[in-house]
UniProtKB/Swiss-Prot annotation:
It comes from the Bacteria. The keyword Membrane does not apply. Belongs to the polyribonucleotide nucleotidyltransferase family. It comes from Picosynechococcus sp. (strain ATCC 27264 / PCC 7002 / PR-6). InterPro entries: ExoRNase_PH_dom1 (IPR001247), ExoRNase_PH_dom2 (IPR015847), ExoRNase_PH_dom2_sf (IPR036345), KH_dom (IPR004087), KH_dom_type_1 (IPR004088), KH_dom_type_1_sf (IPR036612), NA-bd_OB-fold (IPR012340), PNPase (IPR012162). This is Polyribonucleotide nucleotidyltransferase. One of its GO terms (biological process) is RNA processing.
Length: 714
């Protein structure tokens, strides 16, 4: 393919699509640029694998630090494991792309987006999402696109399309919307308690802008002569469908209408139907029967056909009868219970949140500024002081499997709950602690990420973190059959698995703090998205009421948490406080058993579980950094002796010299006649010369001054 460049004027900013220049062996590739940000996106396919029942799509977002003119740290000086933010962008690309491939497709598909250049004004993530659609179209894959994504910010009362990093950090909204000609397909947002009406308006604003990028992709494909591919699905196995349907339809309906069954009971009943009514019946067929031969060769045919029938019957029950598998109404929340302080007080704060069979235990830990996470990626922020980690062990769903490091799902769910709480956390200057919350999913039946939001709120309040408002969350679902649409409140596992939407909404009583919407269909009208947001509000408020019944206000700071004291020193004195090789600051730590962190601006944070130790460290640092004045009296220790005098450490890291003539009244023959190394002496600052050298004396000190100096030193 020859090089081709298409420019799009998009809200006053140019977006360039360059094809035919890079990655000639990829199925399709595009370099998408805006400003000085450039992202190379490729889409490649390989022949399918036998015996799988899922779409083998792999999406990778890669960051290269050369894009920002930086060399990686570490011994190897090269990029290692993708940072968390890169994993989140991989998910951001995957989520709108996955539902646009035919679900019967079994070819391996890999989409790789690599940031080659970074402009601090233009984030690369939404460019990568749009680029994934372009690359896939160029690769000639079956794809229900085009698809595009935009970001919307809110500064003051104005929505901003594709805001800069600075506008994002200073605004009240960070919203990413992906859409197709059929509607909205993905939403990701963090907001500062934004009212529902404003969020809906922002999504509508985004979807209108998306249409320009969709039309640009269509125009590009037309210019390049690329035809849209719409492959036909494989023929259905009507014989197997009829065989299974005739034997199990009524029995499945009966199970789905047994509202007293919990998740495990329902799963067991459905497994029993499959085993006795299908598998045994097929095994009873003659060995050469076509149906038996077919299912023997492809055992997953039975599972897939049975699941498809169960899905159809469950959806029909919801659409036609307005009843869910557990008997709830469409807008009804499962039973909720909450507890705080469920762990011993060695833990700073804990909260247990139960919603139906979903149970999340969240634990809050308060640390010092030195515990902040340093970020080594392309994002301009250099550290995080609030961390949320989400764990999903196999026992939470009654399974056994090896325990691994967190996967993309765990990282994504943790980031969503983190984003939901950020707007209500106290500012650093009011609450200098670094905060880590870990959410342990102990039992899962849907909406564990929103359970983590609720559990985190309980744990933070239990730890004594003065959050502005409590935050709750609910997961909304959707069943769409033709023109019939049903929105479900607080979906459980089977409704998530067999439904068309998973829409997580978190916020306070005043507004939304986080959104995440994923679809299994090719798009949803903005009006339906708006209805889901509105329906989530009473559910969130109901959950908030249950939470505040247990803990209405943050408690006093946990007695197990370190006590922090903060002081400011002259940045020029930081080196003196640290000392050569860290000697001075280590001495303070050993002497007081307090942890000391010093920021580049001279902010010193002192942490200790004992207030007295923190105060002692504070006095030491204040004394050693205060400006010395002639006439000040100190109680110090002789550190070394020379022929003409003795050096005395009057505070950690600061020494002065007593000339031999100032050691005592009258003539002194030898310094050693008056003092020895290790002696503790009272001295007065006699002079500070123009080089900053401190001259001391033992003469002319009043007994009251000496006594005060001894007390101050202690």
């Amino acid at each position: 393919m020859q090089e081709h460049i298409q420019s799009i004027s998009f809200d006053g900013r140019e977006i360039r699509l360059k094809t035919g220049l890079f990655a000639p062996q990829a199925g399709g590739s595009v370099l998408i640029e805006s400003g000085d940000t450039a992202v190379l996106v490729s889409a490649t396919t390989a022949p399918g694998r036998q015996g799988i029942d899922f779409l083998p799509l792999l999406v990778d977002y890669e960051e290269r630090l050369y894009a920002a003119g930086r060399i990686p740290g570490g011994y190897l000086r090269r990029e290692g494991r993708p940072p968390e933010r890169a994993t989140l962008i991989s998910r951001l690309i995957d989520r709108p792309m996955r539902p646009l491939f035919p679900q019967w497709l079994r070819d391996d598909i890999q989409i790789v987006a690599t940031t080659l250049s970074l402009d601090e004004e233009v984030p690369p993530d939404v460019l990568a999402v749009t680029g994934a659609s372009v690359a896939t179209l160029l690769a000639g894959l079956p794809f229900y696109g085009p698809m595009a994504a935009v970001r919307v910010g809110l500064v003051g009362d104005d929505f901003i399309l594709n805001p800069t990093y600075r506008e994002m950090m200073n605004g009240d909204l960070d919203l990413v919307v992906a859409g197709t000609p059929d509607g909205v397909i993905m939403v990701e947002a963090g907001a500062n308690q934004l009212p529902e009406a404003d969020m809906i308006e922002a999504i509508d604003f985004a979807y209108e802008a998306i249409q320009e990028l969709i039309e640009a992709q269509r125009a590009l494909m037309k210019e390049l002569g690329v035809e849209m591919v719409s492959a036909e699905p494989p023929a259905k196995d009507e014989e197997l469908e009829k065989f299974i349907g005739d034997r199990t339809t009524d029995k499945i309906k009966k199970v789905l209408s047994q509202f007293d069954l919990d998740k495990n009971g329902r799963d067991a009943a459905l497994d029993e139907i499959k085993a006795t009514e299908i598998i045994e019946a097929i095994e009873a067929l003659p060995e050469d029967a076509p149906l038996r031969l077919k299912t023997t060769e492809e055992p997953k045919l039975i599972d897939n056909t049975f699941k498809a029938l169960t899905k159809k019957l469950m959806r029909s029950q919801i659409v036609e009868d307005g009843v869910r598998v557990d008997g709830r109404k469409l807008d009804q929340v499962r039973p909720i219970s909450c507890r705080t302080a469920v762990l011993p007080r060695a833990v700073h704060g804990s909260g247990l949140f139960n919603r139906g069979l979903t149970q999340v235990l969240s634990i809050a830990t308060l640390g010092t500024p030195g515990d902040a996470q340093e970020m080594d990626d392309l994002h301009p922020s250099d550290e995080k002081r609030y961390l949320h980690h989400y764990n999903f062990p196999p026992y939470s769903v009654g399974e056994t499997r090896p325990m691994r490091s967190p996967g993309r799902r765990e990282i994504g769910h943790g980031a969503l709950a983190e984003r939901a709480l950020l707007p209500v956390l106290p500012p650093k200057d009011e609450f200098p602690y670094v905060i880590r919350v870990v959410s342990e999913v102990l039992s899962s039946n849907g909406s564990t990420s929103m359970g983590s939001v609720c559990g985190s709120t309980l744990a933070l309040m239990d730890a004594g973190v003065p959050i502005a408002k409590p935050v709750s969350g609910a997961a909304m679902g959707l069943i769409k059959e033709g023109k019939e649409v049903r929105i479900l409140t607080d979906i459980q596992g089977i409704e998530d698995f067999l439904g068309d939407m998973d829409f997580k909404v978190a916020g306070t009583a005043d507004g939304i703090t986080a959104l995440q919407m994923d679809m299994k269909i090719t798009g949803l009208a903005v009006e339906v998205v708006a209805e889901a947001i509105k329906q989530a509000l009473p559910a969130r408020l109901h959950i908030l009421e249950k939470m505040t019944d247990v803990i209405a206000e943050p408690k006093e700071l946990s007695p197990a948490a370190p006590r922090l004291l903060t002081i400011k020193i002259d940045p020029d004195l930081i080196g003196m406080v640290i000392g050569p090789g860290g000697k001075t600051i280590k001495g303070i730590t050993e002497q007081t058993r307090a942890k000391v962190d010093i920021a580049d601006d001279g902010t010193v944070t002192i942490a200790s579980s004992e207030s007295e130790n923190a105060e002692k460290a504070k006095r030491l640092i204040v004394n050693m950094t205060r400006k010395l004045n002639e006439g000040d009296v100190y109680f110090g220790k002789v550190t070394r002796i020379i022929q003409i005098g003795a050096f005395v450490e009057i505070m950690p890291g600061k020494e002065g010299m007593i000339h031999i003539s100032q050691l005592a009244e009258g003539r002194v023959g030898k310094v050693e006649d008056e003092v020895a190394v290790g002696d503790e002496v009272v001295v007065k600052v006699r002079e500070i010369d123009n080089k900053g050298r401190i001259n001391l004396t033992r003469l002319g000190i009043h007994p009251d001054e000496a006594a005060a100096a001894r007390v101050a030193a202690q």
